[in-house]
Regions:
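Phosphopantetheine-dependent thiolation modules in NRPS/PKS and related acyl-activating systems
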Residues: 1-106, 125, 407-421
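ATP-dependent adenylate-forming carboxylate-activation enzymes
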Residues: 147, 168-194, 315-319
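AMP-binding/adenylate-forming catalytic core of the ANL superfamily
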Residues: 287-389
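Conserved C-terminal "lid"/linker of ANL adenylate-forming enzymes
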Residues: 355, 379-421
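Gly/Ser/Thr-rich phosphate-binding loop
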Residues: 212-267
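Conserved ATP-dependent adenylate/AMP-binding module captured primarily in the ANL superfamily
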Residues: 126-145, 184-198, 212
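Conserved AMP-binding loop of ANL adenylate-forming enzymes
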Residues: 136-173
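Conserved AMP-binding A3 loop
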Residues: 105-132
Length: 421
Protein backbone atom coordinates (compact mmCIF):
# COMPACT_ATOMS: atom_id res chain seq x y z
CA UNK A 1 0.00 0.00 0.00
CA UNK A 2 1.33 3.40 -0.96
CA UNK A 3 -0.15 5.80 1.56
CA UNK A 4 -0.82 9.23 0.05
CA UNK A 5 1.41 11.95 1.49
CA UNK A 6 -1.61 13.83 2.88
CA UNK A 7 -2.71 10.71 4.77
CA UNK A 8 0.74 10.18 6.25
CA UNK A 9 0.78 13.82 7.33
CA UNK A 10 -2.50 13.31 9.25
CA UNK A 11 -1.06 10.25 10.99
CA UNK A 12 2.15 12.11 11.85
CA UNK A 13 0.25 15.12 13.22
CA UNK A 14 -2.01 13.05 15.49
CA UNK A 15 0.85 10.84 16.65
CA UNK A 16 3.05 13.85 17.47
CA UNK A 17 0.19 15.60 19.27
CA UNK A 18 -0.46 12.55 21.46
CA UNK A 19 3.22 12.09 22.26
CA UNK A 20 3.70 15.72 23.28
CA UNK A 21 0.40 15.84 25.20
CA UNK A 22 1.39 12.87 27.32
CA UNK A 23 4.97 14.04 27.75
CA UNK A 24 4.03 17.55 28.90
CA UNK A 25 0.75 16.78 30.61
CA UNK A 26 -0.80 19.45 28.37
CA UNK A 27 -3.89 17.95 26.78
CA UNK A 28 -4.78 21.13 24.89
CA UNK A 29 -2.09 20.24 22.34
CA UNK A 30 -4.54 18.00 20.49
CA UNK A 31 -6.75 21.04 19.88
CA UNK A 32 -3.90 23.28 18.68
CA UNK A 33 -2.56 20.52 16.41
CA UNK A 34 -5.49 21.06 14.06
CA UNK A 35 -3.54 24.07 12.75
CA UNK A 36 -0.31 22.16 12.14
CA UNK A 37 0.77 22.03 8.50
CA UNK A 38 3.82 20.96 6.51
CA UNK A 39 5.36 24.36 7.40
CA UNK A 40 4.94 23.87 11.16
CA UNK A 41 8.38 23.84 12.74
CA UNK A 42 9.52 21.07 15.04
CA UNK A 43 11.87 22.87 17.44
CA UNK A 44 10.95 26.58 17.58
CA UNK A 45 9.79 26.83 21.20
CA UNK A 46 9.04 30.56 20.88
CA UNK A 47 6.29 29.73 18.39
CA UNK A 48 4.88 26.75 20.30
CA UNK A 49 1.22 26.26 19.37
CA UNK A 50 -0.13 26.46 15.83
CA UNK A 51 3.23 27.59 14.38
CA UNK A 52 5.51 25.06 16.04
CA UNK A 53 5.47 21.79 17.94
CA UNK A 54 8.22 23.43 19.98
CA UNK A 55 10.15 20.39 21.20
CA UNK A 56 13.32 20.61 23.25
CA UNK A 57 16.35 18.41 22.63
CA UNK A 58 15.06 15.51 24.72
CA UNK A 59 11.57 15.71 23.22
CA UNK A 60 13.14 15.70 19.75
CA UNK A 61 14.69 12.30 20.41
CA UNK A 62 11.46 11.11 22.03
CA UNK A 63 9.44 12.16 18.97
CA UNK A 64 11.86 10.53 16.54
CA UNK A 65 11.79 7.33 18.60
CA UNK A 66 7.98 7.24 18.54
CA UNK A 67 7.87 7.77 14.77
CA UNK A 68 10.50 5.10 14.26
CA UNK A 69 8.52 2.65 16.38
CA UNK A 70 5.20 3.38 14.67
CA UNK A 71 6.36 3.27 11.06
CA UNK A 72 9.12 0.67 11.50
CA UNK A 73 11.82 3.09 10.39
CA UNK A 74 14.73 1.24 12.01
CA UNK A 75 15.09 -0.91 8.90
CA UNK A 76 15.48 2.20 6.73
CA UNK A 77 18.16 3.90 8.83
CA UNK A 78 16.80 7.45 8.63
CA UNK A 79 16.88 8.26 12.35
CA UNK A 80 19.68 10.83 12.12
CA UNK A 81 18.06 12.45 9.08
CA UNK A 82 14.82 12.93 10.99
CA UNK A 83 16.64 14.76 13.77
CA UNK A 84 17.94 17.26 11.23
CA UNK A 85 14.49 17.98 9.78
CA UNK A 86 13.24 21.48 10.61
CA UNK A 87 9.54 21.24 9.77
CA UNK A 88 6.74 18.71 9.98
CA UNK A 89 6.88 18.56 6.19
CA UNK A 90 10.58 17.64 6.29
CA UNK A 91 9.85 14.71 8.59
CA UNK A 92 6.80 13.56 6.63
CA UNK A 93 8.64 13.67 3.31
CA UNK A 94 11.51 11.57 4.65
CA UNK A 95 9.11 9.01 6.12
CA UNK A 96 7.00 8.98 2.95
CA UNK A 97 10.03 8.41 0.73
CA UNK A 98 11.00 5.21 2.54
CA UNK A 99 7.43 4.03 3.18
CA UNK A 100 6.19 4.54 -0.38
CA UNK A 101 8.04 1.73 -2.16
CA UNK A 102 7.75 -0.85 0.60
CA UNK A 103 6.74 -1.23 4.21
CA UNK A 104 6.13 -4.28 6.34
CA UNK A 105 4.23 -3.29 9.46
CA UNK A 106 2.74 -0.61 11.70
CA UNK A 107 3.20 -0.62 15.50
CA UNK A 108 0.47 0.99 17.59
CA UNK A 109 0.12 1.54 21.30
CA UNK A 110 -2.94 0.75 23.36
CA UNK A 111 -5.28 3.70 23.85
CA UNK A 112 -4.81 3.69 27.61
CA UNK A 113 -4.68 7.03 29.41
CA UNK A 114 -3.17 5.57 32.57
CA UNK A 115 -0.57 2.90 33.17
CA UNK A 116 2.14 1.80 30.77
CA UNK A 117 0.93 1.55 27.15
CA UNK A 118 1.33 -1.75 25.34
CA UNK A 119 2.64 -1.95 21.79
CA UNK A 120 1.17 -4.19 19.11
CA UNK A 121 2.67 -4.71 15.66
CA UNK A 122 0.37 -5.35 12.70
CA UNK A 123 1.75 -6.66 9.44
CA UNK A 124 0.89 -5.12 6.12
CA UNK A 125 -0.63 -8.43 5.04
CA UNK A 126 -3.03 -8.53 8.01
CA UNK A 127 -4.05 -4.89 7.57
CA UNK A 128 -4.79 -5.48 3.89
CA UNK A 129 -6.82 -8.55 4.74
CA UNK A 130 -8.82 -6.64 7.34
CA UNK A 131 -9.62 -3.86 4.88
CA UNK A 132 -10.84 -6.33 2.26
CA UNK A 133 -13.11 -7.95 4.85
CA UNK A 134 -14.72 -4.69 5.92
CA UNK A 135 -15.30 -3.67 2.31
CA UNK A 136 -17.70 -6.60 1.87
CA UNK A 137 -20.01 -5.14 4.57
CA UNK A 138 -20.26 -1.71 3.00
CA UNK A 139 -22.41 -0.35 0.24
CA UNK A 140 -21.08 2.27 -2.19
CA UNK A 141 -18.90 4.80 -0.35
CA UNK A 142 -17.97 8.13 -1.94
CA UNK A 143 -16.30 10.00 0.95
CA UNK A 144 -15.09 9.42 4.50
CA UNK A 145 -16.06 11.88 7.25
CA UNK A 146 -13.67 11.19 10.10
CA UNK A 147 -14.32 12.08 13.74
CA UNK A 148 -11.34 10.06 15.02
CA UNK A 149 -7.55 10.47 15.33
CA UNK A 150 -5.70 8.90 12.43
CA UNK A 151 -2.94 7.13 14.36
CA UNK A 152 -4.91 4.78 16.64
CA UNK A 153 -5.58 1.45 14.98
CA UNK A 154 -9.30 2.06 14.46
CA UNK A 155 -8.62 5.46 12.90
CA UNK A 156 -5.73 4.10 10.87
CA UNK A 157 -7.82 1.33 9.32
CA UNK A 158 -11.11 3.18 8.81
CA UNK A 159 -9.93 6.72 8.03
CA UNK A 160 -6.63 5.97 6.26
CA UNK A 161 -6.21 2.44 4.91
CA UNK A 162 -9.81 1.61 4.05
CA UNK A 163 -10.39 4.87 2.13
CA UNK A 164 -7.20 4.16 0.21
CA UNK A 165 -8.30 0.60 -0.52
CA UNK A 166 -11.84 1.51 -1.61
CA UNK A 167 -10.69 4.41 -3.76
CA UNK A 168 -7.83 2.51 -5.34
CA UNK A 169 -9.55 -0.79 -5.96
CA UNK A 170 -6.87 -2.32 -3.78
CA UNK A 171 -4.07 -1.12 -1.55
CA UNK A 172 -1.42 -1.17 -4.28
CA UNK A 173 -2.94 1.66 -6.31
CA UNK A 174 -2.68 5.42 -6.01
CA UNK A 175 -5.10 8.05 -4.77
CA UNK A 176 -8.06 7.00 -2.62
CA UNK A 177 -11.35 8.36 -1.36
CA UNK A 178 -11.55 11.92 -0.10
CA UNK A 179 -11.35 12.11 3.70
CA UNK A 180 -13.08 15.02 5.43
CA UNK A 181 -11.72 15.68 8.91
CA UNK A 182 -14.52 16.75 11.25
CA UNK A 183 -12.91 15.90 14.59
CA UNK A 184 -13.15 19.43 15.91
CA UNK A 185 -16.57 20.30 14.48
CA UNK A 186 -19.88 20.28 16.33
CA UNK A 187 -22.43 17.59 15.50
CA UNK A 188 -24.70 20.09 13.74
CA UNK A 189 -21.79 21.25 11.60
CA UNK A 190 -20.64 17.87 10.34
CA UNK A 191 -24.17 16.52 10.00
CA UNK A 192 -25.00 19.49 7.80
CA UNK A 193 -22.03 18.77 5.54
CA UNK A 194 -22.93 15.13 4.82
CA UNK A 195 -23.61 13.98 1.27
CA UNK A 196 -25.17 10.83 -0.12
CA UNK A 197 -22.60 8.04 -0.12
CA UNK A 198 -20.64 9.38 2.87
CA UNK A 199 -19.35 7.09 5.62
CA UNK A 200 -18.94 8.67 9.07
CA UNK A 201 -16.18 7.11 11.18
CA UNK A 202 -16.80 7.96 14.83
CA UNK A 203 -17.02 6.62 18.36
CA UNK A 204 -19.71 6.61 21.07
CA UNK A 205 -18.60 9.76 22.87
CA UNK A 206 -18.90 11.80 19.65
CA UNK A 207 -22.33 10.35 18.89
CA UNK A 208 -23.58 11.21 22.39
CA UNK A 209 -24.85 14.64 21.30
CA UNK A 210 -26.99 13.24 18.48
CA UNK A 211 -30.24 12.45 20.39
CA UNK A 212 -30.97 16.17 20.81
CA UNK A 213 -30.55 16.66 17.06
CA UNK A 214 -32.47 13.64 15.79
CA UNK A 215 -35.94 15.19 16.09
CA UNK A 216 -35.19 18.09 13.73
CA UNK A 217 -32.61 16.82 11.26
CA UNK A 218 -32.26 14.17 8.53
CA UNK A 219 -29.09 13.09 6.77
CA UNK A 220 -29.03 12.44 3.01
CA UNK A 221 -29.89 8.99 1.69
CA UNK A 222 -27.23 6.30 1.62
CA UNK A 223 -25.05 7.52 4.51
CA UNK A 224 -23.28 4.98 6.76
CA UNK A 225 -22.18 5.49 10.38
CA UNK A 226 -19.40 3.40 11.90
CA UNK A 227 -18.61 3.32 15.62
CA UNK A 228 -15.92 1.64 17.71
CA UNK A 229 -13.76 2.18 20.83
CA UNK A 230 -16.59 1.32 23.23
CA UNK A 231 -20.19 0.20 23.27
CA UNK A 232 -22.66 2.35 21.36
CA UNK A 233 -25.45 3.21 23.79
CA UNK A 234 -29.11 2.54 23.08
CA UNK A 235 -29.88 6.26 22.77
CA UNK A 236 -27.12 6.70 20.21
CA UNK A 237 -28.36 3.74 18.15
CA UNK A 238 -31.86 5.18 18.15
CA UNK A 239 -30.63 8.67 17.26
CA UNK A 240 -28.54 7.45 14.33
CA UNK A 241 -31.47 5.60 12.83
CA UNK A 242 -33.90 8.48 13.46
CA UNK A 243 -31.44 10.80 11.73
CA UNK A 244 -31.81 8.60 8.66
CA UNK A 245 -28.48 6.77 8.50
CA UNK A 246 -28.85 3.97 5.98
CA UNK A 247 -26.43 1.64 7.77
CA UNK A 248 -24.95 1.64 11.27
CA UNK A 249 -22.01 -0.62 12.05
CA UNK A 250 -20.62 -1.11 15.54
CA UNK A 251 -17.10 -2.54 15.39
CA UNK A 252 -15.51 -4.45 18.25
CA UNK A 253 -11.75 -4.35 18.15
CA UNK A 254 -8.59 -4.26 20.22
CA UNK A 255 -5.19 -2.68 19.75
CA UNK A 256 -3.68 -6.16 19.94
CA UNK A 257 -5.86 -7.69 17.21
CA UNK A 258 -7.42 -4.94 15.11
CA UNK A 259 -11.07 -5.16 14.14
CA UNK A 260 -12.55 -8.40 15.45
CA UNK A 261 -16.32 -8.34 15.03
CA UNK A 262 -19.31 -6.23 14.09
CA UNK A 263 -23.04 -5.86 14.56
CA UNK A 264 -25.73 -3.81 12.89
CA UNK A 265 -28.31 -3.79 15.70
CA UNK A 266 -27.90 -3.02 19.41
CA UNK A 267 -29.50 -6.28 20.55
CA UNK A 268 -27.41 -8.48 18.23
CA UNK A 269 -24.35 -10.51 19.17
CA UNK A 270 -21.09 -9.55 17.51
CA UNK A 271 -20.27 -11.53 14.38
CA UNK A 272 -16.63 -12.32 13.75
CA UNK A 273 -15.10 -10.32 10.93
CA UNK A 274 -14.16 -12.37 7.88
CA UNK A 275 -10.45 -12.18 8.59
CA UNK A 276 -11.01 -13.76 12.04
CA UNK A 277 -13.41 -16.53 11.11
CA UNK A 278 -11.84 -19.92 11.74
CA UNK A 279 -9.20 -18.33 14.00
CA UNK A 280 -11.16 -17.49 17.14
CA UNK A 281 -8.81 -19.47 19.41
CA UNK A 282 -6.19 -16.80 18.66
CA UNK A 283 -8.36 -14.29 20.55
CA UNK A 284 -8.00 -16.07 23.90
CA UNK A 285 -5.10 -13.86 24.94
CA UNK A 286 -7.03 -10.61 24.60
CA UNK A 287 -7.88 -8.56 27.71
CA UNK A 288 -11.62 -9.03 27.08
CA UNK A 289 -13.86 -11.91 28.16
CA UNK A 290 -16.14 -13.59 25.61
CA UNK A 291 -19.22 -15.76 25.67
CA UNK A 292 -19.37 -17.61 22.36
CA UNK A 293 -22.97 -17.96 21.19
CA UNK A 294 -22.12 -19.68 17.92
CA UNK A 295 -19.16 -20.53 15.71
CA UNK A 296 -19.00 -16.96 14.46
CA UNK A 297 -20.86 -14.95 17.13
CA UNK A 298 -20.09 -13.81 20.66
CA UNK A 299 -21.15 -11.56 23.50
CA UNK A 300 -18.63 -9.39 25.30
CA UNK A 301 -18.46 -9.68 29.08
CA UNK A 302 -16.01 -6.96 30.06
CA UNK A 303 -12.27 -6.70 30.54
CA UNK A 304 -10.19 -9.11 32.58
CA UNK A 305 -7.99 -6.36 34.01
CA UNK A 306 -10.71 -4.08 35.39
CA UNK A 307 -9.82 -1.17 33.13
CA UNK A 308 -12.68 1.03 31.92
CA UNK A 309 -13.19 2.49 28.47
CA UNK A 310 -14.12 6.18 28.58
CA UNK A 311 -14.59 8.23 25.42
CA UNK A 312 -12.53 5.71 23.47
CA UNK A 313 -9.61 5.61 25.94
CA UNK A 314 -8.77 2.89 28.44
CA UNK A 315 -8.45 4.09 32.03
CA UNK A 316 -7.02 2.12 34.95
CA UNK A 317 -9.03 3.11 38.07
CA UNK A 318 -6.31 1.74 40.33
CA UNK A 319 -3.69 4.00 38.75
CA UNK A 320 -5.95 7.04 39.17
CA UNK A 321 -6.61 6.08 42.79
CA UNK A 322 -2.89 5.66 43.46
CA UNK A 323 -2.15 9.09 42.02
CA UNK A 324 -4.81 10.94 44.02
CA UNK A 325 -3.76 9.08 47.19
CA UNK A 326 -0.37 10.81 46.89
CA UNK A 327 -1.93 14.21 47.63
CA UNK A 328 -0.94 15.30 51.16
CA UNK A 329 -4.57 16.02 52.14
CA UNK A 330 -5.77 12.55 51.10
CA UNK A 331 -5.51 9.50 53.35
CA UNK A 332 -7.34 7.05 51.07
CA UNK A 333 -8.95 7.22 47.65
CA UNK A 334 -11.27 4.88 45.77
CA UNK A 335 -12.10 5.32 42.09
CA UNK A 336 -15.07 3.75 40.32
CA UNK A 337 -17.17 4.20 37.23
CA UNK A 338 -20.32 6.26 37.64
CA UNK A 339 -22.19 3.43 35.89
CA UNK A 340 -22.93 0.28 37.92
CA UNK A 341 -22.78 -1.78 34.71
CA UNK A 342 -19.37 -0.55 33.56
CA UNK A 343 -17.78 -3.98 33.73
CA UNK A 344 -20.79 -5.82 32.37
CA UNK A 345 -19.99 -5.07 28.75
CA UNK A 346 -16.95 -4.71 26.55
CA UNK A 347 -17.53 -1.05 25.85
CA UNK A 348 -19.61 1.18 27.98
CA UNK A 349 -22.47 3.65 27.74
CA UNK A 350 -21.10 6.76 26.10
CA UNK A 351 -21.75 8.95 29.15
CA UNK A 352 -19.60 6.91 31.52
CA UNK A 353 -17.04 8.80 33.65
CA UNK A 354 -15.09 8.24 36.85
CA UNK A 355 -16.16 9.17 40.38
CA UNK A 356 -13.92 9.46 43.45
CA UNK A 357 -14.43 8.68 47.12
CA UNK A 358 -11.94 10.44 49.37
CA UNK A 359 -11.08 9.80 53.01
CA UNK A 360 -9.27 13.03 53.99
CA UNK A 361 -6.32 13.12 56.34
CA UNK A 362 -8.17 15.62 58.52
CA UNK A 363 -11.47 14.44 59.96
CA UNK A 364 -14.52 16.47 60.92
CA UNK A 365 -14.34 18.84 57.96
CA UNK A 366 -17.40 20.98 57.23
CA UNK A 367 -19.29 20.77 53.96
CA UNK A 368 -17.67 24.04 52.89
CA UNK A 369 -14.21 22.64 53.67
CA UNK A 370 -14.96 19.49 51.67
CA UNK A 371 -16.14 21.56 48.72
CA UNK A 372 -12.87 23.44 48.89
CA UNK A 373 -10.91 20.18 49.02
CA UNK A 374 -12.77 18.92 45.93
CA UNK A 375 -11.72 22.07 44.06
CA UNK A 376 -8.12 21.61 45.19
CA UNK A 377 -8.07 17.99 43.96
CA UNK A 378 -9.66 18.86 40.62
CA UNK A 379 -7.01 21.50 40.01
CA UNK A 380 -4.24 19.17 41.19
CA UNK A 381 -5.11 16.27 38.87
CA UNK A 382 -5.75 18.42 35.79
CA UNK A 383 -2.12 18.62 34.59
CA UNK A 384 -1.43 15.02 35.59
CA UNK A 385 -4.34 13.16 34.02
CA UNK A 386 -6.00 13.40 30.61
CA UNK A 387 -9.70 14.37 30.60
CA UNK A 388 -10.99 10.79 30.38
CA UNK A 389 -9.12 9.81 33.55
CA UNK A 390 -10.21 12.76 35.70
CA UNK A 391 -13.03 12.09 38.19
CA UNK A 392 -16.10 14.22 37.54
CA UNK A 393 -17.45 13.91 41.08
CA UNK A 394 -15.89 13.74 44.54
CA UNK A 395 -17.50 12.31 47.65
CA UNK A 396 -16.00 12.22 51.12
CA UNK A 397 -16.18 10.06 54.21
CA UNK A 398 -14.19 8.95 57.22
CA UNK A 399 -13.12 5.75 55.44
CA UNK A 400 -13.46 4.01 52.09
CA UNK A 401 -16.72 1.96 51.90
CA UNK A 402 -15.97 -1.75 52.27
CA UNK A 403 -17.89 -5.00 52.58
CA UNK A 404 -17.86 -7.14 55.72
CA UNK A 405 -14.97 -9.06 54.11
CA UNK A 406 -12.96 -5.87 53.68
CA UNK A 407 -13.42 -5.58 49.92
CA UNK A 408 -13.97 -2.11 48.51
CA UNK A 409 -17.60 -1.55 47.55
CA UNK A 410 -19.55 1.03 45.61
CA UNK A 411 -20.93 3.93 47.60
CA UNK A 412 -24.56 4.97 47.68
CA UNK A 413 -26.95 6.88 49.90
CA UNK A 414 -26.81 4.21 52.61
CA UNK A 415 -23.16 5.02 53.25
CA UNK A 416 -22.28 7.81 55.68
CA UNK A 417 -20.58 10.28 53.39
CA UNK A 418 -20.73 13.80 51.99
CA UNK A 419 -21.49 14.30 48.30
CA UNK A 420 -19.87 17.54 47.14
CA UNK A 421 -19.92 16.88 43.39
Amino acid sequence: MNLPYETLQRIFRDLAAEEMSQSRGDFSISESSREWTAETTIRDRDERGAGSIGVDSLELIQLATRMSEYFGLEQFGIGDSLLRGKTMGDWCRMIHEVMEPAWESITVRSSGTTGAPKTSTHSRQNLERECRGWETLLGPVQRIVSLVPAHHLYGLVWSCLLPASIGQGGLEGQGGLEVIEARWETALRWLGELKSGDMVVGFPFRYQTLPATASTFRVPAGVTAVSSAGELGAQEWEALYRLGFHQVLEIYGASEAGGIGWRGRPEADFELAKHWQGRREELNGLPDRFEWTGKKTCRLLGRKDGWIKIAGSLVDPKAVSALISQHPLVRECSIRSNSPDAQAVQGHPSGIRLKAFIAPVQTGLSTKDLQGLAKVLRKWVEPQLPPAARPVSYEFGACIPRTAMGKEMDWNRSVDHHDVA
